[in-house]
């Protein structure tokens, strides 16, 4: 949308009553089911992997299905969507033959027998819980050679004293420590770090979020590299 010839991307933008309003149709806009789609899509490009085409996937904390949308568009063979809520998944995705919906299920308590297959790619977008509490359930369900891409939300990984106004973690070192903790927790479970990338979009409150690319047997996380990625994300 352009108002008076200028791009207007925020609802609170102040405009002149007489300014011309133009809504443009962007043919290149993929129109993902939610904002999360752009986050995962951008992270996969930045990480250079993992391969999605032809693989069985799990979307943990699927919500409306932004991540699921990306997986399907990248050629996933099937996607199982697990969420503690009910009826949240976008109807277009819910009615896709490749999608299995498992609602009213706490990912932390999920068992391999709850799923129709052992997922080869697992993506996770979870809130109000530390990933350290969820990783054991995710890795227990994973297929041999699986790739795991959790989105780290620092506000749920650091102590309350590190969370500022509006629920935002503003200290880059606290953000880096949040990512390091999740990478270390995964390594303790036998899953090393293949890559780390900042999300191309912030969370709703402005928190900078990060994706880890984890695989069983991969190398130990590099705390220096994590710090560099976090600092780059902080700098925009």
Walk through the language-model features, giving the residues of each.
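Flexible, glycine-/basic-rich loop-and-beta segments that form/coincide
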Residues: 208, 213-236
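Glycine-rich SAM-binding Motif I of class I
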Residues: 65-66, 87
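A short glycine-rich, Lys/Arg-flanked "PGG" loop and its adjoining helix->strand segment in the class I
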Residues: 132-149
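S4-like RNA-binding module at protein N-termini
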Residues: 1-50
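S-adenosyl-L-methionine
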Residues: 78-133
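Conserved class I S-adenosyl-L-methionine
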Residues: 52-63
């Amino acid at each position: 949308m352009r108002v008076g010839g200028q791009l207007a991307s925020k609802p609170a933008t102040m405009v002149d009553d007489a300014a011309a309003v133009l809504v443009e149709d962007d043919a290149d806009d993929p129109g993902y089911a939610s904002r999360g789609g752009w986050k995962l899509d951008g992270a996969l490009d930045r990480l250079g992997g993992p391969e999605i085409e032809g693989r069985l996937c799990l979307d943990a904390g699927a919500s409306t299905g932004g991540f699921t949308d990306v997986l399907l568009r990248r050629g996933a063979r099937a996607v199982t969507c697990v969420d503690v809520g009910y009826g949240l998944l976008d109807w277009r995705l819910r009615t896709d033959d490749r999608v299995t919906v498992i609602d009213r299920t706490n990912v932390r308590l999920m068992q391999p027998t709850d799923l129709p297959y052992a997922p080869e790619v697992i993506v996770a977008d979870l809130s109000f819980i530390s990933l350290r509490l969820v990783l054991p359930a995710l890795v227990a369900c994973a297929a041999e050679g699986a790739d795991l891409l959790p989105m780290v939300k620092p506000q749920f990984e650091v102590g309350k004293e590190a969370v500022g106004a509006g629920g935002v973690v503003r200290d880059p070192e606290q953000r880096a420590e949040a990512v390091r903790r999740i990478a270390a927790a995964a390594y303790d479970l036998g899953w090393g770090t293949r890559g780390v990338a900042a999300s191309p979009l912030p969370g709703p409150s402005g928190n900078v979020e990060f994706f880890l690319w984890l695989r069983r047997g991969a190398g130990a996380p590099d705390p220096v590299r994590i710090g560099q990625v976090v600092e780059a994300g902080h700098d925009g």
